[in-house]
Design a protein with these regions (language model features):
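C-terminal and inter-domain tail/linker signature
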Residues: 21-302
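Domain-scale selection of a single, long terminal region
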Residues: 3, 17-18
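Bacterial N-terminal signal peptides
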Residues: 8-17
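Bacterial N-terminal signal peptides that target proteins for export
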Residues: 1-8
Length: 302
């Protein structure tokens, strides 16, 4: 047969495959959460061999690049009760806050997966090995209902608007000014399972400059936008130089900085923001301390 014939056959095969991929339905909420559960179940079984992954799948744990199947994959021994999902069908990404057992001990996990052509191409995780965090999340049992509400289409903000509002939260922290970000009067913040916004609330607490020991929040990676529930999730690096020795809080005067902050360190934070009526209503975070200057393998290195 002629060379032209084989070229036509090859072109037809390529076109058919392309059309098949185009006709494949998008990975919706159920699909994304299915991938997440499949991943977590495989982790507990210590067996990634049957996971649908791309040939170049990238896996990190606490900002260290590992081979899929290493790290927590070798020590996870069961799933907990608390399970919270953030779904972004438009970008093919899904995030998770939840509890697990590691060799019988309770831990918490922030995890993000990227799905491309029905295969996992990225898996990024932060592990919180704290029995207290595990216990508090297990006691809660389930996410706050406000994080599970499907917001009417007419009341939804765009992806750009949601991300911009969440970013103002970090600006407010860096500036020590709660008025920089649009906080709802009922805003609460939970970190590693514990409410940390205190009696003052999200905005007024920042005005005390209690977070002035945080030198810089960078990079700020907004990765999952759950438009249906108006939630933004990402991973963010809090960097602390350790050179702030005291704080001058309005109305409280000068007082010493807590000892734990008087050293250089960074904190990798998986954080979610529920936005309602253009304001931050709820902040949830799981975080772990890292050496100062730590960088995510998912961020281009300088």
């Amino acid at each position: 047969m002629s060379k032209t014939f084989w070229m036509i056959c090859a072109a037809a095969t390529f076109l058919t495959a392309t059309m098949a991929r185009a006709a494949e339905p998008a990975c919706d909420r159920g699909c994304l959460e299915g991938f997440m559960n499949q991943y977590l179940d495989a982790m507990v079984a210590h067996d990634p061999s049957h996971l649908p992954v791309t040939p170049t799948v990238k896996f990190t744990e606490d900002d260290v690049a590992l081979k899929l199947g290493d790290g927590l994959w070798g020590t996870a021994s069961g799933r907990g009760v608390y399970r919270e999902y953030f779904d972004d069908p438009e970008e093919g990404q899904v995030a998770f806050f939840g509890t697990l057992k590691e060799n019988g001990h309770g831990i918490a996990l922030a995890l993000r997966l990227k799905i491309e052509n029905r295969r996992i191409s990225e898996a990024e995780s932060v592990v919180v090995r704290s029995p207290r965090t595990f216990d508090m999340m297990e006691k809660a049992g389930a996410p706050d209902p406000v994080l599970l509400e499907t917001v009417p289409q007419a009341d939804r903000l765009s992806r750009t608007q949601l991300t911009a509002i969440a970013n103002q939260y970090f600006e407010a922290i860096e500036q020590g000014n709660g008025k920089v970000a649009p906080f709802d009067a009922d805003c609460n913040r939970f970190e590693n399972g514990m409410r940390t916004s205190g009696a003052l609330g999200c905005s007024a607490q920042l005005d005390t400059q209690v977070f002035n020991y945080i030198s810089r929040i960078f990079p700020r990676r907004f990765l999952v936008v759950d438009s249906d529930r108006q939630v933004v999730f990402g991973f963010f690096m809090f960097n602390h130089r350790g050179d702030v020795l005291w704080v001058n809080s309005p109305g409280e005067g000068k007082h010493d900085m807590m000892g734990a902050a008087k050293r250089p360190f960074s904190v990798d934070v998986g954080e979610a923001f529920r936005i309602k009526d253009h304001k931050i209503l709820k902040v949830e975070a799981l975080m772990t301390a890292l050496p100062y200057g730590a960088k995510s393998p998912f961020v281009p290195q300088e």
